[in-house]
Amino acid sequence: MELSLKDASGALEVSEATFGREFNEALVHQVVVAYAAGARQGTRAQKTRSEVSGGGAKPWRQKGTGRARAGTTRGPIWRTGGVTFAAKPQDHSQKVNRKMYRGAIASILSELVRQERLVVVENFSVETPKTKELVAKLKGLELKDVLIVTKEVDENLFLSARNLYKVDVRDVAAIDPVSLVGFEKVLITADAVKEIEGILA
């Protein structure tokens, strides 16, 4: 199959297996959820009654006061007590096989092509790290909410986009399912397309 180039005449020959496969919604959902779960910090921590300091002394004698019996001030019903089912640090990451991950990426790319949200260009760069220059280039391509994917990290491009809302720059090695589905359009260079094909082949 072929992808038309936005900034030049002609088209780019690409693999049907990478850019023309059927959309697998269940797979994409599973991989996106797993990826988002892996980004969770998981460092929350609360103390149980055995971990809260103090509470060793019996607050008042067992009988004769008229009050309910109590043996500690650190039980969960006390204001300064521990938490009944205390949250503990945990790892939220989920295992995703390489084949599943690559399949999800290919499925997303194919759907972007079908929805005409994948914009392929021969080359995309800025001469100096100036936001104004990048904004002008994106305006010429009628792009606002966009993920820019290049074969390798372009420092000028990265610095130019750093202060722009809903614009991100990634190299091929840094793309992930969440970033691909999180933007209205994906602007990708021809070199990056070939690099992705090589990885997903």
Swiss-Prot record:
UniProt keyword annotation of Mitochondrion present: no
Membrane-spanning segments: none
The protein's role, per its UniProt record: One of the primary rRNA binding proteins, this protein initially binds near the 5'-end of the 23S rRNA. It is important during the early stages of 50S assembly. It makes multiple contacts with different domains of the 23S rRNA in the assembled 50S subunit and ribosome.
Keyword Transmembrane: no
A molecular function (GO) term: rRNA binding
Name of the molecule in the record: Large ribosomal subunit protein uL4
Organism listed in the record: Colwellia psychrerythraea (strain 34H / ATCC BAA-681) (Vibrio psychroerythus)
GO cellular component, one term: ribonucleoprotein complex
Gene giving rise to this polypeptide: rplD
One Gene Ontology biological process: translation
Span list, region Disordered: 43-73
Keyword terms: Ribonucleoprotein, Ribosomal protein, RNA-binding, rRNA-binding
Complex formation: Part of the 50S ribosomal subunit.
Similarity remark: Belongs to the universal ribosomal protein uL4 family.
